[in-house]
Amino acid sequence: MMVNIPVIENFLSNSCFLILFLTTVYYWLKIGFGGKSSFSFTGLTGYGSALCCLTLQLILRWVDSGHFPLSNLYESLIFLAWCLLLLYIYIEVSTKTLFLGVLTSPAILCLVAFTDFSLPTELQQSTPLVPALQSNWLVMHVTVMIASYAALLLGCFIAIAYLVLSKFFIKTTFVTAPLSSQNTVLRQESFLEEKQKTDIVFEKNDKNLKFLFFLDNLSYRTIGIGFCFLTLGILSGAIWANETWGNYWSWDPKETWAFITWLTFACYLHSRLVGGWTGSKPALVASFGFLVVWVCYLGVNLLGQGLHSYGFLNV
Amino acid sequence: MQHCVRASAGATAHHAVGTYRCRLPLLAGPCQRTALPWAHTKLPAAHRTRCRVDCRSTQGPAAAPSLSDSDNEPSSTSGWRPPRPPPPPQGPSPLRQLYKRTLKQLSNLKLALAELAVIAALSAVGTVIKQGETYEFYMENYPEEGRKVLGFLTGRIVVALQLDHIYTAEYFLLLLALLGASLTACTITNQWPAVKVARRWRFKGEQASLARLEVASRVPDARLVDVGRVLAAKNYQVFMKDGQLYGFKGLAGKLGPIGVHASMLLCMAGFVTGALGGFTGSVMIPQGSETVVASALRSASPLAWNPGGASAVIRCDDFRIDYREDGSVRQFYSDLTVLDVDGREQSTKTVSVNQPLRFGGVTAYQTDWSMSALKVKVAGSFVAPEDTAFQLPMAALNGGDSKLYATFLPAEDPALAPPGTAPRGVSMLARDLQTVTFYDSKGEFAGVRRLGSGKPIEVEGMTIVAQEVLAATGLELKADPGVPLVYAGFGGLCVTTVVSYLSHSQVWAAQAGSGVIVGGTSNRAKVAFEQELSDMLGEVPEVLQQAPDLVDGNGKADSSNGSSSGGNSSSSSSSGSKDSKEQVL
């Protein structure tokens, strides 16, 4: 039975986009019109089906090309969306919050839209591997790196949300209790030190601050996981390079930017662990880290030269 | 069963004020415990000095602590100071003082963060400015006149600041060395002592200090040994002494960060060894030829020592490219033989891109290839009219990204051509090992032939059959003595990074009357720790005192959770029911 794989792939990518679009709308409506805001079964079903579409698409590409489906930019973007979806589902189930879906579903939707509709068609084709990529290290190194990008991007995104919301909430707090501003500051700090609660409703100021603390903690934990994967990814890349070219570090732009990303998040983690920072200051570092990860992942490939370039933008 | 295990908010209020450094919201100061005779009372000197060193772990509210948690500095707001030690009779020698002061400066966290930031910024500069190009390239791309890049960046500045080879510039290497020094200093001053501290377990006997712990609760009608048993069942290591208990789990999570820094230092040692002691070089070996390895190797520095394999000879028996149907390369294969100085064969291997050849400390990687000669059979050449076999050397043509090699077959004797003019002839170009393209004297395209097809082509009066391209394999030879160290450092880094995410949990308990006060802290996953402690305390069996009139007391206390399942069991005096009640302190 001859299965027309490109047609099926097209169908899968379109349906993935549609499902994510519907899920985004659903989350926004659900938050906008109130209701209990623990995790949403319908929303998770939406995410789960999008995840299934992407999984099928990757498996089909694997069968079609004969090699692990992570050899070009298109496949790595799909894999990034896959990792983000998986990570998000895990977070929503384990922390039982709904609000993150409002933030992350449009982000993942944009990512999938860019991947399927903006990337030139010739980059979407699966091409056979060049000799340098024909190695088992491909599976280990690239999957771990993409997984680390997913965790870091999600963590930084949450940190940016924290910054935006904290500006918004702190204004509200000050407006409602202007005479006791000193107490408000202390109260905010003490709330930040309490353990997280799970209700997220925005009417009460207390709940707002608890939610901010929750965002802060969640971004810290997610970036922590991402940093661990990033370390493993960089090291596996170095060992692979040594096996292939005899040089574990050649200051290639992609390698250098991965190192810069690692240094940025090392600063973030040390400022938290050793310096004891919480709240806005590490969130600012994480927002900067958000840009750094994008430059490392896409900027270098699209603009630069080197061992990792696709170079279809000539600058 | 309802358990209320509440974080001590009382400590929070105390510690919200004050510098961020001394804010220890949720830990008991060690100084509190000196009141009890059987507790460890002596703070070792290292801890006292460490109170003023910045590169130590404080416990932030949402952060993981501390390599040396709960042991160091007194809280600034507790109002209790340890008695100052008497001044030493004689100061340490100036050299030792200098050493200590340098260590303290180097292990400053802000300095370390600044180093990381500057290294990151300089690395980024190196990705924007193309590295390793010629002087003319920078003159051309960063012009002196007209529109300067960024308004001021000219080629001369780029070269003067060594921005064209920034990763080997002295200031960059010095920065890396400084980072290594900071890592070493931090390990010596802070992290190594933490290992020693970790081995000494400290009891907390005073109720107040137990209450001040992150997670604290009182278990009424329980015995310390039962608490210890429950903890041990959950893989805690438990120590008990004189009515006090200390248990910990996951010590690896506390030692993990030390391992991370030590592994990084090992990697750096490997980098330095490789940079100073290595040999590198590349060589093109045509099919059938051989080359002495040592002739291709260049040392990285005068300190390099010769690898054993440098005296070997590599012979390339064959080089072939595996092409796919669409003409792209699937893989390169070289059949290599290693011979020793006397010509005896040592080993043979078919090398391809991800499969290098290792011998005597030298590794040969397949990285490049070229064409060295083209074998043709020509009828009607100026040399002889009948079929003659030629082996024409090929040269690489510059320009474009892909390889292009060409050779030339003169149609007339070059010696007879007028001086200053090129003789007539056929140009033969090849991009890969599959086809050859022919051009005549005027540069017009004459035809394409597949190598090995045997089909002749008529150009410039000659009949040519292109038979075979003799290729040369391009090998990168490397001898890097630092690689074992680097790999060891990498392996350590992989393991210790993962291990650092483990939770190091500690639990203290003390018998207080009929009940037990339990408190604990964890450096990661605090919420999970609270839940775990709560569950564990739920399993502590209830032990009632003997006096029968206490039955009523228990019955009354029972109403707090209303679960007197087996009201009759509560009247027994042995550890009966598995229910447990807890009260919030």
From Swiss-Prot, chain A:
Subcellular location: Plastid, Chloroplast thylakoid membrane
Alphabetized UniProt keyword annotations: Chloroplast, Cytochrome c-type biogenesis, Membrane, Plastid, Thylakoid, Transmembrane, Transmembrane helix
GO CC annotation: chloroplast thylakoid membrane; plasma membrane
Source organism, top-level taxon: Eukaryota
Membrane-traversing stretches: 15-35, 39-59, 73-93, 97-117, 144-164, 222-242, 257-277, 283-303
A GO MF label: heme binding
GO BP term, pick one: cytochrome complex assembly
Membrane topology, as annotated: Multi-pass membrane protein
Known partners and oligomeric status: May interact with Ccs1.
UniProt similarity note: Belongs to the CcmF/CycK/Ccl1/NrfE/CcsA family.
Function: Required during biogenesis of c-type cytochromes (cytochrome c6 and cytochrome f) at the step of heme attachment.
Name under which the protein is recorded: Cytochrome c biogenesis protein CcsA
Gene encoding the protein: ccsA
